[in-house]
């Protein structure tokens, strides 16, 4: 239970349960008020951005899986497939290079259309 100090009309200090709820899941009681632990908040945001990065890369890789299969089988790619492969690889490079330390304000590149 979080306690809040309250001064009575006679000047006595008494402790009572705090009535103000935290604003974020990262708020901690400092004895007088809720204070946001911005380091913890930022750390969680960066972890989420890293997970988002991997999800974007996985989606991009899935979009070229048939092209990869053709290459592994030694088949020649058509010009459109080569172009698509290069475009998606450039996108993956851009996603990989994206700075996640600015989370939650990360600007991700757009996945190229097929």
Swiss-Prot record:
Q: What is an example of a Pfam family matching this protein?
A: Caudo_TAP
User: Which PANTHER family does this one have?
Assistant: PROPHAGE TAIL FIBER ASSEMBLY PROTEIN HOMOLOG TFAE-RELATED, PROPHAGE TAIL FIBER ASSEMBLY PROTEIN HOMOLOG TFAE-RELATED-RELATED
Family label:
Belongs to the tfa family.
Report what the protein is called. Putative protein TfaS
The species this protein was found in: Escherichia coli (strain K12)
Whichever gene encodes this chain, its name is tfaS
